[in-house]
Curated annotation (Swiss-Prot):
Quaternary structure annotation from Swiss-Prot or TrEMBL: Homodimer.
Residues holding Mg(2+): 13, 40
SMART domains given in the database record: Adenylsucc_synt
Positions with a binding annotation for IMP: 13-16, 38-41, 128, 142, 223, 238, 302
Catalytic activity: IMP + L-aspartate + GTP = N(6)-(1,2-dicarboxyethyl)-AMP + GDP + phosphate + 2 H(+)
Encoding gene, per UniProt annotation: purA
Binding, substrate: 298-304
GTP-binding is among the record's keywords: yes
Database matches in HAMAP family: Adenylosucc_synth
The family this protein is said to belong to: Belongs to the adenylosuccinate synthetase family.
InterPro entries: Adenylosuccin_syn_GTP-bd, Adenylosuccin_syn_Lys_AS, Adenylosuccinate_synth_dom1, Adenylosuccinate_synth_dom2, Adenylosuccinate_synth_dom3, Adenylosuccinate_synthetase, P-loop_NTPase
Function: Plays an important role in the de novo pathway of purine nucleotide biosynthesis. Catalyzes the first committed step in the biosynthesis of AMP from IMP.
Protein name (database record): Adenylosuccinate synthetase
């Protein structure tokens, strides 16, 4: 048995959906532990491309229990839309469970999110406008609506009547927006409650029961380490904790049940929205990465900013999450390049810096120090074993593993499940501390 956390080692969009889908084959339970509809993941199965925002990737496996944990924030309309989409494709959602203590995104959250971002002007932070930040803010202020509140009609009416009256003052006085009709919102969300009710459980208890039966549990993070509220490029971050430690809080488990952490990173780097990005490319190579990598957001459709691989933030992600091994995705996107650059350190005001700075202002002043390596100029999308890769591609992977000080367990060479090289067992491999002690950081 192994309980594994899958996290993004960059700014999100690393390909966690595909990796989680692959690992879900050997999982009994998959738990999404944070975030909301601001995060999207894409899974390609045969000719079908599924884009999901809330439902865990493991939903494609009928024997895998899929749980939306208490650390998430749920937009019921979007969630039920995903359920309907899957059922129309003949994919059952009977094995989908929803934490009763997850918070609910309401219409006023979306309105406040969008109006607040617009009001920021040139100081915007790049929110998706889906109401995630305001939902988490209400959670912290202890005024939020939880899934279990939806299940209590009288309590919901009382709570929403008071809350909407308060939010209408904010909408009017602060943003100049028309008020919401409380009765309409109560009626709408009461309808959602009845459709969600069969899926609602005490998720912490459900996960504990699975653990006691020695089931394999996979914890699925959304977004990435550099978007973490506490450890990311603040203030250009999300409102939750995508890091591995967030899995315990967002799922309702103790840290001792986590056996392994798998970090997912692209073979280059992308970022959506605002914020510093030292290795960002603005010319032809940046455009090539964007087009070949289809770098457009699953949630918003926004064009992703593209740049070279940044080993400084990679090492930071390894440290913050305790990453045991890596899954490197989209290696094939680099196939046509004559040479590839990797950021190995930063120059800040003439001094070398090997570590990620906590200040966004300092990070914005970082100039990347690059190591240039040769490209391989041939297709890798057909490769299924390390031996099939061009030597330069294999050398590139080894270089990344050395810089990150963890082994590479999975290499993804395309969106399909079969476009994957399993280098070593990502679930049952040795712990990072042992690898570090032995000095073993190669990719093979």
């Amino acid at each position: 048995m192994a309980n594994v956390v899958v996290i993004g080692a960059q700014w999100g969009d690393e390909g966690k959906g595909k990796i989680t889908d692959l690992l879900s084959r050997s999982a009994d339970v998959v738990v999404r532990y944070q975030g909301g509809v601001n995060a999207g993941h894409t899974v390609v199965v045969g000719e079908q491309t599924l884009k999901l925002h809330l439902i865990p990737s493991g939903i494609l496996y009928p024997d895998t229990q899929c749980i939306i944990g208490s650390g998430t924030v749920i937009d019921p309309k979007v969630l039920l839309g995903e359920v309907e989409m899957l059922e129309q494709l003949g994919i059952s959602t009977d094995h989908l469970l929803i934490s009763q203590t997850a918070h609910v995104t309401m219409p006023y959250h979306r309105l406040i999110d969008q109006a607040s971002e617009q009001q920021r002007g040139s100081h915007k932070i790049g929110t998706t406008g889906r109401g995630i930040g305001p939902t988490y803010a209400d959670k912290s202020e202890r005024t939020g609506i939880r899934i279990l509140d939806l299940m209590d009609p009288e309590g919901l009416r009382e709570q929403l009547t008071w809350t909407i009256a308060q939010k209408n003052v904010i909408l009017d006085k602060l943003y100049g927006l028309p008020p919401l009709d409380a009765e309409s919102v109560i009626e709408e969300y009461s309808g959602y409650a009845e459709r969600l009710r069969p899926h609602v459980v005490d998720s912490s208890l459900t996960i504990d029961e699975a653990w006691r039966k020695r089931k394999n549990i996979l914890f699925e993070g959304a977004q990435g380490t550099l978007l973490d509220l506490d450890h990311g490029t603040y203030p250009y971050v999300t409102s939750s904790n995508p890091v591995a430690g967030g899995a315990c809080i967002g799922a309702g488990v103790g840290p001792t049940i986590i056996d392994r952490v798998i970090g997912v990173a692209k073979a280059y780097t992308t970022r959506v929205g605002e914020g510093p990005f030292p290795t960002e490319l603005h010319g032809d190579i940046g455009e090539l990465l964007c087009q070949r990598g289809a770098e457009f957001g699953t949630t918003t459709g926004r064009r992703r900013r593209c740049g070279w691989f940044d080993a400084v933030i990679g090492r930071y992600a390894v440290r913050i999450n305790g990453i045991d091994c890596l899954a490197i995705t989209k290696l094939d996107v680099l196939d046509d390049l004559d040479e590839i650059q990797v950021c190995v350190a930063y120059d800040i005001d003439g001094e070398r810096c090997d570590h990620f700075p906590s200040s966004a202002r300092s990070f914005a002043n970082c100039q990347p120090i690059y190591k240039t390596v040769p490209g391989w100029k041939q297709s890798t999308s057909h490769c299924r074993n390390l031996e099939d890769l061009p030597k330069a591609a294999l050398d590139y992977l080894k270089f990344l593993a050395e810089l990150m000080e963890v082994p590479i367990a999975i290499v993804s060479l395309g969106a399909s499940r079969d476009q994957t090289i399993i280098v070593e067992d990502p679930i049952h491999g040795p712990k990072r501390a042992l690898l570090h002690t032995n000095g073993d950081s190669s990719a093979s």
